[in-house]
């Protein structure tokens, strides 16, 4: 990709470099891809972000690099050929949905909601979903290293978009974790705790380790 031609193998393998160079908006994608993509793709993505997107953009370099892989060592040519391949790429479809991807002729399911799994409705304390008698889900944080365009936890995860205001965790992390542990101590029937988020890859190791030790 044009903007990363001079990146070293050491930089590429560095998790902090990957985080620092995530694609977060259309302008950054344009800088990265250069003339590989036609203008119509950028316009399509920009319209989706303004009118339909439920997730903000956050795509790390490694994920961008998996889109439109070379076939027998040959990449599609810049412009129309690469743009068509980019539109058709399954990872692009999942990570960077555009306006033309969305089927407006198919209505949403009648029971479709922002929180389709009703996790928030079943919070025992903030961030702890107790749906089944012996199992709970601990949502430790509302962020991920990358944002999938069709996240099933979109009500909580990521930044708000022009048409979608996200649910915000009100408590401080240390207070939320303490409340979760207190509830679990008072609920001995729970045997299975799924520690999730967001993605715990974004959680400082000492905080995750401290929670698991107490758990």
Label each residue range with its predicted role.
Residues 63, 144, 148:
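Conserved, mostly hydrophobic/aromatic
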